[in-house]
């Protein structure tokens, strides 16, 4: 039985309507001047009162026009919101279980199932729980109606019979009270009938036996998606509640661009704390890779090349040149190292090589006279511009201005000639004058011990923060010494420093 509201709502004057638009900060909420004649509720507009009146009359003027859908609504907004459920596209996704929804409010209601601190409403009579207060109130109204109470627990309206009250409760549940649904759609393989075509398609798995829905936790298969969902909630509830907390792996840009293998000798040094790294004199570290392998020609294509980089504290690290992009091979004419350069000598420089070998043979017989000659000899070590002719091929090995400016502070009385020979391998093989592809050098074991004994003191001076000269300056000086050996005009000057 529908109850008619006394008075016609269309007769309400337009001047009594609440002003539309957003309220300003200082304004108060609009007064609810439009009370309902059947209940105690009041509204601030005629439209809202009219929509509310449909809950008493059971009228639903806005009907869905989709095929096989008999739903109707009290407002145009609710009809438009419902029409989104007929769309095949689901735009709202749950971040916990990746379930998709047509409407945002459906997703919001679904998120309550993942909230560990969610507020649930539990019925004391049957123990059923509800996430929303409205659903809980509808459930309590059903209990009250079956017990004989003729008052609606949702809107507090009284009815004359239990049947009328139950029919009224459907309006609060969003269901139409007019007409009885018919099962219009029949299965082709059996006599069962269903309300919608979707129910028929879901029923078809009984006849086909297909099980397309696989459980990702136990590999059990199901023919219907709702059966899989029920299985997941029942058997794998803990796995569903776990949130994916694994961060995205951000790759190191250095390791992405170049794969640099570090030698085993550097691993104990790199594992030291930073305080010990700055205070400890690296007597052994300076000797790392001093005599790696016999120097090979950069023109040899069959062998793997190695490039030795100089770390900030004077440590050297070999880099496999095959791991670098091939375009980088053009940028390095000779490998960077604390030792002498691996130089491919052209044919026109072969006479110069004989002079270098004869000089090195004379160098083995004698030792530096004293450390007093170091300032004078350091000025003759090729720190002056080379006077070689451009036809000598020494242009590729000429000393740059930057290396000259760095090596100038090293011309101090505290500098010994033994420091200039830190590029000579201490424990290398004996000098072989017949070796063609290398510039190997050697000297007596006594000179090696004297050089090693003097290395720690000089290393501590170089590690001093007040000293502006780093170990890289020694490397550049070694390069200057090597480049000075390549010119025939500077060899006699360097030889006179030891006489």
Curated annotation (Swiss-Prot):
Q: What keywords does the record list, in alphabetical order?
A: Acetylation, Activator, DNA-binding, Isopeptide bond, Metal-binding, Nucleus, Proto-oncogene, Repeat, Transcription, Transcription regulation, Ubl conjugation, Zinc, Zinc-finger
Q: Which PROSITE patterns match?
A: ZINC_FINGER_C2H2_1, ZINC_FINGER_C2H2_2
Pfam families given in the database record: zf-C2H2 (PF00096), zf-C2H2_4 (PF13894)
Region Massively activates transcription, residue ranges: 384-499
Task: Describe how it is modified after translation.
Answer: Sumoylated with SUMO1; which inhibits transcriptional activity, but does not affect nuclear localization. Blockers of sumoylation pathway such as SENP3 and inactive UBE2I increases transcriptional capacity. Sumoylation is increased in the presence of PIAS1. Acetylated by lysine acetyltransferase EP300; which activates transcriptional capacity. Lysine residues that are sumoylated also seem to be target for acetylation.
The family assignment reads: Belongs to the krueppel C2H2-type zinc-finger protein family.
Q: Which PANTHER family match?
A: PLAG1 LIKE ZINC FINGER 1, PR DOMAIN ZINC FINGER PROTEIN
Protein's UniProt name: Zinc finger protein PLAG1
Organism, scientific name: Mus musculus
Upper classification of the source organism reads: Eukaryota, Metazoa, Chordata, Craniata, Vertebrata
Gene name linked to the record: Plag1
